[in-house]
Amino acid sequence: NSYTKEIMRDTENLQKKIFKEIEGRIKLDDESLPFKDKKYDYWTKTTKEGNYSKKLRKKIGSDKIECYFDGDLEAKGKKFFSTGDLAVSNNDEFLAFSVDDKGGEYFTIFVRRIGDNKIIEKIEDTAGGIVWSYDDKSFFYRKHDSQKRPRQILQHRLGSPSTEDILIFEEKDERFTCSIDTTSCEKYYTIETSEHTTSETYYFHKDEKKFEPKLVLKREDGILYSLDSFDGYWYIHTNKDAEDFKILRCPNDKMNDWKDFVPAKSGTLIGGLTFLKKWIIRSEISNALSKV
């Protein structure tokens, strides 16, 4: 702003020098490594001329590259532009993305049909955080309270007005904020509500006619835990009775029958799990060294 510009006027040359040095250490024309998701490889590209990244994909076995989101194109003509979330539907046909173009941290969600680039849905004044339903007939998103805290999870069905969106979950404690995610087994949704040192998780199955989140473990002050499901088991990463965390698991049909999967280790920080088709990856840190 004008005040900052005036106060810092005598450092303008130094600012330019520092900026050029920082810029010189960054590879502006760059592409991320691709990652496979269902039928496509996805990656991100940045250019020296642009201020925002491009999101690209290529069907596996094809040479045709699609740009399904161009940040510079979306930001054109806007004084402020910030992307909240990008989510491609499970059938690869739709892109849901959230944008704040005013700087107030209220995001408008758009749904674009990737094939013809047409916007087919728009929901204003959300907190972003988009998660598609497994059948691609709807998606979930977060809603702010009056203090800009995301404390509601709503479901929007494609083709219906946003006034008919269904409230799936609401956090009553003003200290907590909530988010929604899918599990690695692609059968459940999880809702996590948390503050800095305490968390609580709910889950519901994708085939439920009416989604009713079920509590996993009741919140306890100072206890953090996160939930995932894979290959018939629930997994919890928690610091309950484990200062540096541990991992428990139980069968999907025996939610309370928790057993140690990765026990706590004194002086070792236990990281979470990543599930692949045939492998489980985990990390830990001990003696200031990371291990996978």
Predicted regions and their residues:
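Beta-propeller folds
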Residues: 1-292
